[in-house]
């Protein structure tokens, strides 16, 4: 793959919306459309292959487990060889994973596709490192906030498209996601410039292995505290993401198409929160305060979800809970990512953000596994009792994240003094 290192990617950092930054946002957006198409459809697809709620949880978990194992590696490779080739290969691999799932006629092949997609989809830290390369420390929080908004946009378009396509068969959204990823990889190859100059790349061998780097980074007081809160947040949110489709199908009787539209609504709220409100509030309150506010909103909304239903507030009550939950996540998640980036040296952005996203991937693996155990009853189905304990557990985890945030507020405030 021919390397294209363009000095404007590093030279125009005083101007926020540079061409490389716009291109990486478009690339991430297209990548996340494909990802967003999978979430509301996968539970119904797995159920068509006679999967139990627990097995569906494992399907969600195995994807993130692969990301946990491979995110630091891809981040480190991007520090050595540049961001562009890693992004290209990983997005191309995502297309392969989607094709495998689309052609699957057994649960084993669905698992295989999820494993392939998880390995090659561990590129979030590389994209974040690209953003760190082309932004200044002063506007990095804004850059990460807009990166989070790309997630929201992906969760608007992806689930909505999946909902429409699911009417033609549960396989169709996966074929569409595969074609979209393939087109994205081709476009990236021709238009995305490299952001990391050769002189800023790390040597291949640095005298320590990945596990030592991982443990060493987490032992640091500031970085470790940020990662603990981030891990708890992602765990709770992943329990909800896994359980939500099964919950709405059970409590409201929503179909795959209707769940796609509901996830699209959540995406709209996420875009508003991360794309508009986050930048406004972070300038006035700072990242540490937004982390605390976000954790509180998420805990409260997760606690309230089991109490809503057709006879208790109807769909409107559920939408209110989803709105509060999404806004809470829109405040806390990019604030934590921004803090993690600010305390990291420039030449370690890829590997450190890879470590942070690796922990998040472990949380995304743990969340569905926990949810799968809690939501599954003795008859391999769900009921009111399993719904209650699943969402109450997620709420308790966010309450713990809030307590850690409040206790460690001095630690994370020190980041602002350092930066």
Q: Which residues does each predicted region cover?
A:
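Helix-breaking motifs and short loop linkers at transmembrane-helix boundaries and internal kinks
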Residues: 50, 82, 103-108, 253, ...
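Conserved MFS/SLC helix-loop-helix module at the cytosolic interface between two early adjacent transmembrane helices
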Residues: 68-107
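C-terminal transmembrane helical hairpin of 12-TM major facilitator-type secondary transporters
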Residues: 288-336
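A membrane-interface helix-boundary motif in multi-pass transporters
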Residues: 166-179, 373-399
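Helix-to-loop junctions at the C-terminal end of transmembrane segments
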Residues: 71-82, 273-287, 375
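Juxtamembrane intracellular "pre-TM" segments in multi-pass secondary transporters
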Residues: 6-18, 193-229, 251
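Short amphipathic helix-loop junctions that connect adjacent transmembrane helices
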Residues: 40-54, 242-259
